């Protein structure tokens, strides 16, 4: 039984174990089935077109959509089946748990009943045990006298006392005239000098046990000075006295007797009796504590009682009482010290309540009875001591003789301890004697007093009587032992039942937790199923819409495909006809070559003359086809050129201000020249002078107006657009793994990166072609500059995350990346005046003329040639961000050398000289572009030049430098090879190379423009933080004059702190800033300790001002009682005590507000506190209360108590109820309820008199057995009623702070 008692099992009556799930592995716990992971239906959405733009067939798209819908339906059915299985599993488990809980509830009820029955059987036995134990002590005598002798001191000589046995002390009187000079004194117990404190307390312990059983016990320590009285009671640090040993024994016995239905409480009182005047030794406590009455009704004293929970608290309280005792040794010798331990026992089942006390009294020195040489100063003290000790001796003698009544009215000590001297009380007198011969007279006097108290003769007494009572005591002891054994057995049985009950409760708790878990799992699954159904329905709706859109798109694509097929068919026919003509021409040519050699020269010339028109005709036909193809290419180039022109306009609109226009730019060369140079020069064929996407720097703005500009992150944007959301989603969801080949990835990434430039208010399902980008660009330009800034800010994080993600693949167009980053840097410059003062190096510092002649191969192999150019920055009003040395880009151009030999070779090869010149120029331009690109990689100084210099101005400066350093380019020419054309081509090649290099990343960091953007952004953040630091520092030193100024300063500092935290949060989430691993540097946050301290001080000052206003509001209420005025002044004093928590700058304002309020309160006239008069005149009219709130108190009777409460104009609690409960339909009375502080100093009878003026329900609800209990109940009732009245809630809170509502037990 003991082995299985602590285990939890299912095998109980009426409970079936859970059945395992079919297919589950043996030994595995029962768990709800889990579904296999499944791909979302949207994973089967049709993929985009490939790199060549081919369209997926319509049938395949529809089949994929049908498969997606089918998968969604299957997922929905699986989820529904899982939810059904889990619901069935939960219901089955809940049913089993419910049945088992019912069984446990029945078992718990039976165990409770058994425990009550056992308690009922034990209680009479415990009472019988206590009675028998008390009878045993009574048989031994209600008054016991012990005698104790201290050891001899070194200077006291020989001893005059002997100890024949444990009950007799023999004193050598030294009187030679007597036959036997030795006298014997018999006591209940005699202790020699060798007896310690422990053995003494062993005989005192039965009296302590009797005190715990409910009987009053008094222990007196009597004897001459320096005989050991104080040592017996107090002891030493290593050998405790009766004070501590008695309480420790009480504490241990109470712990062993305490059950779940009973409880012991201990209190201590200590007083000093001097000249019949009582002084409380524990009354120095500042906080109000409960008091207890001691003594007879005619002459009682009220002493402070302190509750002690353990021996340590008792020791501290006793130590405090002894320290408060008089320090005058003579006064201590003639005073009584009374230490009382009050014992309260309560049984919550039977309702039994017992009260007893254990009093330990340190009596004055016994020589006070013999002092004959008392002077005038202490004769009064000795007279009072003599009277007190004589009366105590008479009382003890009367008790020993079993005479009634006890003479308790003769002295103050007997009046205070009247309930401990007589009746069933137990009294112990411990007599202390000195063994020295010099103290013989005092020893004999002490022994004579104790013999008189014991009522014993100076003989051995009647041995027969003693033997008889000893036999009776032995019988009682044996009977007591049997009863104790029976009680012990019953207690063991109760402990076993309690253990079983605890185990049952633990099982109930476990099952209840299992039930809660099952309910949570069931509710979670139902919620998940519901959300899954909603999500599937939404997906189905979206797929349906997408299906409709795809159908419309497919229909349009079919039309376009049909048109393209027709055009392709026409083109095929044209090609076939041209091929036929070409074949005929070739055949004619072969015939001409195979003709006879004998023909004459004239015939040959005539044949060639005749064939020339035919070849010209066929050549004209092929040239027409070529011309058509060139026209289409020209249209495409013109479209791209228009696109870049519109792009340049977009850049200009982002930064241009009123009165500032863009710099003039050189016109671009013709398409003919571009096509002649070939397609290898990339994007320079159509852009020329517009090759770099840069725009003029705006004029400096007002610093005051833009000092608070903040670089906002994407999550801080307040306004979004549907198209911006689409672009963000497209950039973040771009997956390079969906493309086949690097070319396809590059094409998709570059097209996607161009979307931010051509953003309009419509959504794209696929990447739009270049023709659509032009229309988009026009729409963006039409939207205005403000809208463009919003669009840039909206997609900022997505753009830079996309660029960072694609940088390692090296597939993006670096010129396009440069344009994007320059766009964002200039947008930042337009909003940040602190960046507009940055000075950059001129373009001449980045160009250097090569002085060495080297071949093209050597130039390509060692390019770019760089030489350091040292220069000094201007440290004037403008600042420089790029402080590194600027290196020059070496331009290696040689003049063209014309030779007749090369012209002859070209003519022999059939190549026109102009065509060859264009070919050579294109190769040289490509070489310069590559060198310029390599030079620009990671060059932040060059990046700053591009950002801060307009595009047209930068290209003009490059052309001017080329014309100045290469004089052979300055010759005027009218064709493409002329100076003007060459300067334009060279400057464009350098610009394109630099632009491409600035957008090329250099791992592990990013490209030069990205590094520059990171540094600019950090500078903006740092400027904003320092600006907020300056504002906060100014506010922190400003002196507050009045409450409005305090509130304004606090609000301003909180606003600045909020902005600073917001900026720090933006810095942590900004994707532009480079991390430490990427080469970025951290931003230091300026210290804000002083500002934080001032803000905390202002918050405290604001709270103090609010409390001052509350005091002023309460002081305006009439009438103003004296107690309320005192409470208000104390509240102001508390506020003055809170001033050290403020800074020195806030002290004047706080002190001014408090002192003004104090003057107002002190100047008010108060009404005296007259509770009786107020209660007699507290009848009001119902019209004075604007609103009544009804409360119903259910007390277990047939009719509940109904009380209506409200507030009058003086903010006092007013109630309306029946005057008598027995007459519920009688007249209702209206009374003002006094505050709990009114009853603080009233007696119990006075409180009853106050309640007689109120409705009877108040008396029944608040009246207790004692005054303290009544005050505690009334405080809770008053708080309950006042909390129901809205107008009194603030007053109730103030009363709680003032400690008016305080339980007596606390």
UniProtKB/Swiss-Prot annotation:
Protein name: Kinesin-like protein KIN-14L
Amino acid composition bias (Low complexity), ranges on this chain: 855-867
Binding site for ATP: 223-230
Keyword Metal-binding: no
Coiled-coil stretches noted in the UniProt entry, renumbered to this chain: 466-507, 540-595
InterPro entries (alphabetical): Kinesin-like_fam, Kinesin_motor_dom, Kinesin_motor_dom_sf, P-loop_NTPase
Compositional bias ranges of the Polar residues kind: 592-611, 660-677
Organism encoding this protein: Oryza sativa subsp. japonica
Lineage: Eukaryota, Viridiplantae, Streptophyta, Embryophyta, Tracheophyta
Biological process annotations from GO: microtubule-based movement; microtubule-based process
């Amino acid at each position: 039984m003991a082995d299985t008692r602590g285990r939890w099992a299912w095998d109980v009556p009426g409970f079936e174990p859970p059945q395992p799930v079919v297919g589950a592995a043996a030994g595995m716990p029962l768990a709800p089935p889990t579904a296999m992971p499944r791909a979302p239906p949207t994973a089967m959405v049709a993929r985009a077109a490939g790199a060549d733009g081919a369209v997926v067939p319509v049938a395949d798209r529809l089949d994929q959509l049908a498969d997606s819908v089918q998968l969604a339906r299957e997922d929905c059915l699986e989820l529904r089946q899982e939810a059904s299985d889990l619901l069935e599993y939960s219901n089955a488990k809940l049913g089993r748990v419910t049945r088992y809980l019912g069984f446990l509830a029945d078992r718990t009820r039976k165990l409770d009943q058994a425990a009550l029955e056992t308690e009922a059987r034990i209680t009479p036995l415990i009472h019988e045990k206590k009675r028998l134990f008390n009878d045993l002590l009574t048989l031994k005598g209600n008054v016991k006298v012990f005698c104790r002798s201290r050891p001899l001191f070194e200077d006291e000589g020989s001893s005059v006392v002997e100890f024949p046995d444990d009950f007799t002390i023999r004193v050598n009187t030294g009187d030679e005239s007597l036959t036997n000079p030795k006298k014997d004194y018999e006591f209940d117990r005699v202790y020699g000098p060798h007896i310690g404190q422990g053995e003494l307390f062993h005989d005192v312990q039965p009296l302590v046990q009797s005190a715990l059983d409910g009987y009053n016990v008094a222990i007196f320590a009597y004897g001459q000075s320096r005989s050991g009285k104080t040592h017996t009671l107090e002891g030493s640090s290593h050998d405790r006295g009766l004070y501590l040993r008695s309480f420790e024994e009480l504490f241990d016995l109470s712990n062993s007797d305490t059950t779940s239905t009973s409880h012991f409480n201990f209190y201590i009182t200590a007083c000093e009796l001097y000249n019949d005047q009582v002084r409380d030794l524990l009354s120095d406590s500042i906080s109000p504590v409960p008091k207890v009455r001691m003594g007879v009704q005619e002459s009682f004293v009220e002493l402070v009682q302190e509750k002690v929970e353990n021996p340590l608290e008792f020791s501290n309280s006793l130590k405090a009482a002894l320290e408060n005792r008089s320090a005058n040794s003579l006064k201590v010798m003639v005073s009584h010290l009374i230490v009382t331990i009050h014992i309260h026992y309560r049984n919550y089942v039977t309702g039994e309540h017992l009260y007893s006390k254990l009093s330990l009294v340190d009596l004055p020195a016994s020589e006070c009875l013999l002092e004959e040489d008392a002077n005038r100063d202490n004769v009064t003290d000795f007279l009072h001591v003599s009277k007190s000790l004589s009366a105590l001796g008479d009382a003890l003698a009367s008790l020993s003789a079993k005479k009634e009544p006890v003479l308790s009215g003769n002295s103050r000590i007997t009046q205070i301890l009247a309930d401990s001297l007589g009746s069933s009380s137990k009294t112990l007198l411990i007599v202390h004697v000195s063994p020295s011969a010099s103290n013989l007279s005092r020893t004999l006097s002490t022994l004579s007093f104790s013999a008189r108290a014991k009522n014993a003769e100076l003989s051995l007494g009647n041995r027969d009587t003693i033997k008889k009572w000893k036999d009776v005591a032995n019988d009682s002891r044996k009977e007591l032992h049997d009863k104790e054994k029976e009680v012990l057995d019953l207690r063991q049985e109760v402990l076993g039942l309690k253990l079983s009950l605890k185990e049952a409760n633990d099982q109930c708790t476990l099952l209840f937790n299992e039930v809660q878990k099952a309910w949570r799992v069931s509710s979670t699954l139902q919620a998940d199923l519901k959300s899954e159904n909603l999500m599937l329905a939404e997906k189905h709706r979206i797929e349906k819409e997408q299906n409709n859109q795809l159908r419309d798109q497919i229909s349009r694509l079919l039309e376009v495909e049909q048109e393209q097929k027709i055009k392709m068919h026409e083109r095929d026919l044209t090609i076939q006809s041209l091929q036929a003509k070409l074949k005929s021409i070739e055949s004619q040519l072969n015939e001409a070559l195979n003709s006879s050699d004998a023909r004459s020269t004239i015939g040959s010339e005539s044949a060639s003359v005749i064939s020339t028109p035919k070849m010209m005709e066929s050549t004209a036909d092929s040239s027409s086809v070529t011309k058509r193809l060139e026209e289409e290419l020209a249209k495409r180039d013109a479209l791209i050129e228009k696109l870049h022109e519109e792009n340049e306009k977009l850049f200009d609109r982002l930064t241009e201000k009123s009165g500032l226009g863009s710099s003039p730019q050189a016109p671009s060369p013709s398409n003919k020249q571009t096509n002649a140079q070939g397609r290898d020069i990339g994007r320079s064929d159509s852009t020329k002078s517009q090759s770099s996407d840069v725009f003029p720097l705006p004029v400096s703005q007002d610093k005051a107006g833009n000092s608070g500009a903040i670089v906002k992150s994407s999550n801080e944007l307040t306004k979004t657009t549907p198209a911006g959301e689409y672009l963000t989603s497209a950039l973040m969801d771009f997956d390079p793994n969906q493309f086949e080949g690097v070319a396809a990835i590059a094409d998709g990434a570059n097209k996607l990166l161009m979307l931010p430039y051509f953003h309009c208010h419509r959504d794209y399902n696929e990447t739009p072609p270049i023709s659509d980008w032009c229309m988009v660009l026009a729409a963006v330009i039409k939207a205005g500059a403000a809208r463009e800034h919003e669009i840039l800010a909206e997609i900022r994080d997505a753009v830079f995350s996309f660029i960072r993600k694609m940088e390692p693949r090296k597939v993006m167009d670096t010129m396009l990346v440069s344009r994007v980053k320059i766009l964002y840097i200039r947008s930042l410059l337009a909003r940040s005046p602190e960046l507009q003062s940055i000075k950059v190096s001129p373009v001449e510092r980045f160009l250097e003329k090569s002085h060495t002649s080297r071949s093209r191969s050597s130039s390509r192999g060692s390019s770019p040639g760089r030489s350091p150019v040292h220069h000094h920055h201007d440290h004037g009003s403008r600042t420089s961000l790029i402080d590194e040395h600027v290196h020059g880009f070496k331009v290696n151009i040689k003049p063209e050398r014309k030779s007749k030999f090369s012209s002859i070779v070209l003519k022999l090869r059939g190549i026109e000289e102009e065509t060859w010149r264009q070919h050579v120029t294109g190769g040289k331009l490509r070489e310069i572009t590559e060198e310029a690109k390599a030079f620009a990689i990671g060059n932040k100084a060059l990046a700053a030049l591009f950002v801060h210099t307009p595009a047209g101005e930068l290209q003009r400066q490059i052309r001017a430098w080329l014309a100045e350093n290469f004089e052979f380019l300055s010759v005027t020419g009218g064709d493409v090879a002329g100076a003007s054309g060459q300067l334009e081509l060279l400057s464009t090649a350098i610009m394109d190379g630099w632009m491409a290099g600035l957008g090329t990343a250099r791992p592990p960091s990013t490209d030069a423009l990205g590094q520059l953007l990171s540094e600019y952004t950090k500078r903006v953040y740092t400027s904003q933080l320092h600006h907020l630091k300056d504002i906060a520092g100014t506010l922190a030193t400003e002196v507050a004059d009045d409450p409005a100024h305090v509130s304004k300063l606090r609000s301003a500092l909180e606003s600045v702190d909020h902005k600073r935290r917001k900026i720090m949060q933006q810095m942590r989430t900004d994707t532009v800033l480079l991390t430490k691993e990427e080469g970025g540097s951290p931003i230091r946050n300026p210290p804000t300790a002083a500002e934080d301290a001032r803000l905390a001080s202002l918050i405290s000052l604001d709270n103090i001002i609010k409390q001052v206003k509350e005091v002023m509001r309460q002081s305006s209420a009439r009438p103003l009682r004296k107690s309320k005025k005192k409470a208000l002044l104390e509240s102001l004093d508390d506020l003055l005590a809170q001033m050290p928590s403020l800074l020195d700058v806030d002290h004047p304002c706080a002190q001014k507000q408090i002192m003004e309020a104090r003057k107002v309160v002190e100047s008010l006239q108060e009404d005296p506190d007259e509770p009786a008069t107020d209660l007699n005149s507290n009848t009001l009219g119902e019209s004075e209360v604007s609103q009544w709130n009804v409360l119903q108190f259910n007390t277990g009777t047939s009719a509940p108590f109904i009380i209506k409460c409200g507030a009058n104009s003086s903010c006092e609690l007013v109630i309306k109820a029946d005057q008598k409960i027995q007459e519920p339909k009688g007249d209702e009375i209206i009374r003002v309820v006094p505050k709990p502080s009114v009853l603080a100093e009233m007696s119990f009878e006075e409180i009853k008199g106050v309640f007689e003026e109120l409705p009877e329900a108040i008396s029944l609800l608040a009246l207790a057995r004692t005054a303290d209990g009544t005050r505690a109940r009334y405080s809770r009732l008053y708080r309950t009623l006042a909390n129901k009245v809205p107008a009194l809630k603030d007053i109730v809170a103030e009363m709680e702070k003032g400690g008016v509502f305080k339980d007596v037990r606390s």
